């Protein structure tokens, strides 16, 4: 893993002014970024969201998933606290890529759930890798976090990278009639920590 920090810039948003920090991975040719707000230094745990790219949810406002709602909720939560970071990883479709995600959606249209669709295409249920986070966390000076997540794999990944998780903050939002089956599959087959009747 060859992660290199590139540059930072201001990013005005509907939730206030963030700093955007660019990183490149020479092994995968992917570009990742961190959105940060406030001073991340010190011993106090930093409010953090690990968010994998979802073009359909983040940019096209798809209701098939909860990704866009989760991203916006994380930005809002950080703006209220005045301090935090979102690690935005270019791992579209739980790591299978955009076109394969469309293929998976096609299978879901025919009745497969999100896990069955991935497996029918020859992929694992979740192909994401989080190893790039270690140098990104080091660059940002973050070693202790309050992690906004429902996904136990992210918790395990950060612990494995030596990140101290002071607290897990449930991050349920965006449930609607179009994604309720998807969310139940994430809870039942992927072990996500969901209540099942969140808003």
UniProtKB/Swiss-Prot annotation:
Q: Which Gene3D superfamilies match?
A: GTP cyclohydrolase II
InterPro entries reported in the protein's UniProt record = GTP_cyclohydro_II, RibA, RibA-like_sf
Entry's EC annotation:
3.5.4.25
Q: Upper taxonomic classification of the species?
A: Bacteria, Pseudomonadati, Pseudomonadota, Gammaproteobacteria, Cellvibrionales
According to the UniProt entry, its GO molecular function terms are: GTP binding; GTP cyclohydrolase II activity; zinc ion binding
Which Pfam families does the entry mention?
GTP_cyclohydro2
Q: Which domain of life is it from?
A: Bacteria
The protein's role, per its UniProt record:
Catalyzes the conversion of GTP to 2,5-diamino-6-ribosylamino-4(3H)-pyrimidinone 5'-phosphate (DARP), formate and pyrophosphate.
| Catalytic activity from the UniProt record | GTP + 4 H2O = 2,5-diamino-6-hydroxy-4-(5-phosphoribosylamino)-pyrimidine + formate + 2 phosphate + 3 H(+)
Protein name listed in UniProt? GTP cyclohydrolase-2
- Top EC class of this enzyme: hydrolase
Q: Which UniProt keywords apply?
A: GTP-binding, Hydrolase, Metal-binding, Nucleotide-binding, Riboflavin biosynthesis, Zinc
């Amino acid at each position: 893993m060859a992660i290199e920090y590139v540059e930072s810039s201001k990013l005005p948003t509907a939730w206030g002014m963030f700093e955007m920090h660019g990183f490149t991975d020479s092994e995968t040719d992917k570009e990742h970024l961190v959105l940060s707000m406030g001073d991340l230094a010190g011993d106090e745990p930093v409010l953090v969201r690990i968010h994998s790219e979802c073009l359909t949810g983040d940019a096209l406002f798809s209701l098939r998933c909860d990704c866009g709602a989760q991203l916006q909720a994380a930005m809002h939560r950080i703006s209220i606290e005045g301090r935090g970071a979102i690690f935005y990883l270019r791992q579209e479709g739980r790591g299978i890529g955009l076109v394969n995600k469309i293929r998976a959606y096609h299978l879901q249209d025919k009745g497969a759930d999100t896990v069955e669709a991935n497996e029918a295409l020859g992929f694992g249920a979740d192909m994401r890798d989080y190893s790039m986070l270690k140098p990104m966390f080091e660059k940002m000076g973050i070693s202790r976090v309050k992690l906004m997540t429902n996904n136990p794999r992210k918790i395990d990944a950060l612990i494995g990278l030596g990140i101290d998780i002071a607290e897990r903050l449930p991050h349920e939002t965006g449930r609607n009639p179009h994604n309720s089956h998807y969310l139940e599959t994430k809870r039942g087959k992927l072990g996500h920590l969901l209540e099942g009747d969140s808003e």
